[in-house]
């Protein structure tokens, strides 16, 4: 992966120290940053899509990875995730202490650590959203409340509605 990044002169950051990697992959790390071993910063939308496509072709889909809660997985990859947001803090975009974008129709979107994938309403995602994905949980339980969240898993309160 690093040779690809450097050969294409991409901006990136990565976790270097083994102890830091283990810490990042532990349940002690915030859900918004857990699992992010390497982060690439594309220069524009076109390079973003090219990078995703090329990495998807290079990294085996069968390789297990850590699910990144704040990002969206690319296609059926377990290792390639993306999100929308600022690369660095810019004082010109700070509102109420958070990096903020304003849409053409006055919409406001703030970039801060989140536990789920989030796009501004005026930005079209590069993939179709698949909200119909079924799971054992969704097929058998009605969730009433989230009791605890962590990068190691969540605890829910709900009722069984189908055995």
Predicted features by range, described:
Residues 1, 144-163:
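ATP-binding glycine-rich loop module of kinase domains
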Residues 26-31, 38:
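Extended charged low-complexity segments that act as oligomerization/scaffolding linkers
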């Amino acid at each position: 992966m690093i040779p690809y990044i450097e050969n294409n002169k991409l901006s990136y950051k990565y976790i270097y120290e083994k102890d830091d990697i283990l810490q990042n992959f532990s349940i002690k790390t915030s859900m918004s940053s857990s699992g992010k071993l390497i982060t690439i910063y594309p220069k524009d939308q076109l390079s973003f899509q090219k990078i995703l496509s090329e990495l998807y072709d290079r990294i085996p889909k069968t390789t297990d990875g850590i699910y990144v809660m704040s990002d969206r997985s690319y296609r059926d990859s377990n290792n390639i995730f993306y999100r929308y947001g600022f690369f660095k803090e810019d004082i010109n975009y700070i509102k109420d202490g958070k990096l903020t974008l304003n849409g053409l129709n006055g919409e406001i979107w703030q970039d801060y650590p989140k536990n789920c994938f989030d796009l501004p309403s005026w930005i079209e995602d590069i993939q179709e959203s698949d909200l119909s994905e079924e799971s054992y949980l969704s097929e058998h339980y009605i969730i009433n409340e989230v009791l605890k969240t962590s990068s190691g898993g969540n605890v829910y309160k709900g009722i069984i509605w189908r055995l």
